[in-house]
Amino acid sequence: MDMNNESENELPSIQLKIERRSSHPWIFQKMVEKPRGNTGRVANGCIVNVVERDGKWVGRGLYNAHSRIALRILTAKQDEAIDRQFFSRKIQQAYQLRQEILQLNRVTDAYRLIHSEADGLSGLVVDRFADCWVLEFFASGMYYLRETIQSVLLDLAPQSNFYWFAEDHVCKQESFDCRSPAPPEPFLIQENGLKFRVAPGSKHKTGFFLDQRDNRRRLSQFCSGKTVLDLCCNSGGFGIYAKTLGKAQEVTGIDLDEQVLTLAKQNAQLNQATIRYIQADLFTWLRDIAPSGRTFDVVILDPAKLTRDRESVDQALRKYRDMNRLAMQAVAPGGILLTCSCTGLVSEADFLDMVRQAAWQAGREALVFQICGAASDHPFMLHASEGRYLKAVFCRIL
């Protein structure tokens, strides 16, 4: 997309059907009039001006007639163009938060730079892994602007390389074809003195679960001399923290995915951590060990997202309840359970109620002593709470 062809006054104008009563950057299709008259056909993903029925200014942003989210407002300032300077300002602001305020460079060379709406760039996520920027697109318009975004990122880190992608369901919803480059070979990042091999382009997010950084460190504080069970261990983050920084006596990691277990074993070796990894379905494995009465002092349960569909939330909660019940039965009396959900459609209140139900079914008591979310490089706006998706609940199981 050429950002220099049209001034802001020459952009297509999209009119709303009703008065806008929210500052949320999303405007849904049902609220938007179809382009007509002088506006003519408006290309999906292009930048448009947005006005109310009476012509009152709303903002400027990305338009997509095929998406449920028809408009993503990027600025409410009538005199602010969506150009390279705009992206430079937004990315610099985000960089200042991560480096000057949060000072993440003291802790890691891998962090989230752009967290979509929270950083003023709806439809875009940017993660940094050492010298590689990984861009994930949730809006066709952001995908079409990727060259501009990359050029700004190169201003921050001139020696960087890039990988970008959009998940299949996003491409379908947004009606665009995201052509990703060849993924880079796995490489190393560091976090809190530990090393991890990351693989952007693998099927598990952008390469590593950056959102759990603070929770990994927090969990390790409870592991000294303990036996630890890491369910849905993925590439090994929680278990490796528990064994190295936490000085756990014994760590067992369970995951069904052979690919991520290979990565977990490599990460354990990088950090000289002796960890037992088992490829298994957690439901089957936990049911199999139950008759023996085997328990662990610390259990982590961090499954992948269970649903993207509002109609399936109740089903997801039932699955969470079943796996939490089994996990609680594997916790030694007085032990610790860290149970997590990255399913944004499941509210914190509903997740906590699920934990209550699971404890009752397991014949245990769950004493919640801390509730956390994503790491601080995943901020959220109070008027766009979708960015606050992760629930990490620390419980003592009695």
Protein language model annotation of sequence segments:
Residues 131:
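Phosphate-centric recognition/catalysis
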